[in-house]
UniProtKB/Swiss-Prot annotation:
Chief localization: cytoplasm
Homology family: Belongs to the SepF family.
Organism for this UniProt entry: Mycobacterium avium (strain 104)
InterPro entries named among the record's database cross-references: Cell_div_SepF, Cell_div_SepF/SepF-rel, SepF-like_sf
GO BP, sorted A to Z: division septum assembly; FtsZ-dependent cytokinesis
PANTHER family from the UniProt entry: CELL DIVISION PROTEIN SEPF
Official protein name in the record: Cell division protein SepF
Basic and acidic residues compositional bias, start-end: 36-58
Entry's transmembrane regions: none
Compartments it resides in: Cytoplasm
Function (record text): Cell division protein that is part of the divisome complex and is recruited early to the Z-ring. Probably stimulates Z-ring formation, perhaps through the cross-linking of FtsZ protofilaments. Its function overlaps with FtsA.
Keywords: Cell cycle, Cell division, Cytoplasm, Septation
Subunit-structure text: Homodimer. Interacts with FtsZ.
Length: 214
């Protein structure tokens, strides 16, 4: 459109249909870059490229050996806490743990142990007494006076009576020039003057279970 025609159209001297405004023409702008209507192809994506949160999860095949569900209780049996039976707390015999207490170099040769109790050996007539109360002190004194080595097992006595009997035996050994030795807890050996029992023999007798030879 020429400039003259535009002036005529502005003052009403030319029909308005012939007036074309480049700023209102949506078909194609006359200058500048074309205005995209929707998109120019960049950033375009398909709906399939993104996961739909409402979509069901993929049904993957189960691992080999898996059968699903829970194990049948009848197949494996009901599982219950293991019940432990409390062992009977019986009082062990003194000789039983002594027989198993020594191993290796400290253990005495069984042949040497047997020789200690052969006829004619001082320990062959040794005796073991297990008094229940102090009234049995007389028996201990008579055996010791006759030249018999005596083992006093005071385990079954209460502490008060055991202490009295220990004092009695110590005085008895002193009066008759014997010896009085402790071989284990609440177990003592009274040896007459003519019976020589070395400390090593006393220890090994106790550790290897002297009570098996009484």
């Amino acid at each position: 459109m020429s400039t003259l025609h535009k002036v005529k159209a502005y003052f009403g001297m030319a029909p308005m249909d012939d007036y074309e405004d480049e700023y209102y023409d949506d078909r194609a702008p006359s200058r500048g870059f074309p205005r995209p209507r929707f998109d120019d192809g960049y950033g375009r994506y398909d709906g399939d490229d993104y996961d739909d949160p409402r979509r069901e999860p993929a049904d993957y095949p189960p691992p080999a050996g898996y059968r699903g569900g829970y194990a049948e209780e009848s197949r494996y049996g009901a599982v219950h806490p293991r019940e432990f039976e409390r062992p009977e707390m019986g009082r062990p015999r003194f000789g039983s743990w002594l027989r198993n207490s020594t191993r290796g170099a400290l253990a005495m040769d069984p042949r040497r142990m047997a020789m200690m109790f052969e006829e004619g050996h001082p320990l062959s007539k040794i005796t073991t007494l297990r008094p229940k109360d102090y009234s049995e002190a007389r028996t201990i004194g008579e055996r010791f006076r006759d030249g018999t080595p005596v083992i006093m097992d005071l385990v079954s006595m209460d502490n008060a009576d055991a202490k009295r009997l220990v004092d009695f035996a110590a005085g008895l050994a002193f009066a008759l020039r014997g010896s009085f030795d402790k071989v284990a807890t609440k177990v003592f050996l009274l040896s007459p003057a003519d019976v020589d029992v070395s400390p090593e023999e006393r220890r090994r007798i106790a550790e290897t279970g002297f009570y098996a030879y009484q």
